[in-house]
């Protein structure tokens, strides 16, 4: 795995960050994380030549690695109120979003229901020498209560409605970035002020569904 990381990928990451900046991503920390993350190790080798295109790609198990713009946009939204000390990620998937988050906070807690994806993501994070990520094989709808509350929560698949457990695990003053919906999905920001949750709609998006229940 580590042999797949080299100078060429560093340059490719920098070019991708420049492209995302031209499309409106402005947070320096997010752009730096994108530039320093070898996206090609998070996709199947047969698709590595497309890794630095601004497009979603299949990673197996009916899942995808999100479009880099969406990864950057959601990360930027998480940081809008400052640097969170901890982040809960629902849907580890390829681990690419996880790798970006790990460069933006002290600790990432990531939940994935498909064990094979979790194993692969762990290998990629080790290859990047990122060690501030804890992973759980679990139902994303339930979050990770024992590790909360969380300054920020990001959901990388779309539930039909906002899971109540995630609202409960959001710290006072924290923010949740989540795509919601079935056929039509909207990216939302939910901020917590005591027992009050304020919701803001960002833009239309397209994600795989956040499946509750059985683990794979």
From Swiss-Prot:
One GO cellular component term noted in the UniProt record for this chain: cytoplasm
Annotated Pfam families: PCMT (PF01135)
GO molecular function annotation: protein-L-isoaspartate (D-aspartate) O-methyltransferase activity
Localization per Swiss-Prot or TrEMBL: Cytoplasm
Keywords: Cytoplasm, Methyltransferase, S-adenosyl-L-methionine, Transferase
InterPro entries for the chain: PCMT, SAM-dependent_MTases_sf
CDD domains: AdoMet_MTases
Function statement: Catalyzes the methyl esterification of L-isoaspartyl residues in peptides and proteins that result from spontaneous decomposition of normal L-aspartyl and L-asparaginyl residues. It plays a role in the repair and/or degradation of damaged proteins.
NCBIfam families linked to this entry: pimt, PRK00312.1
HAMAP family (UniProt xref): PIMT (MF_00090)
Protein name as annotated: Protein-L-isoaspartate O-methyltransferase
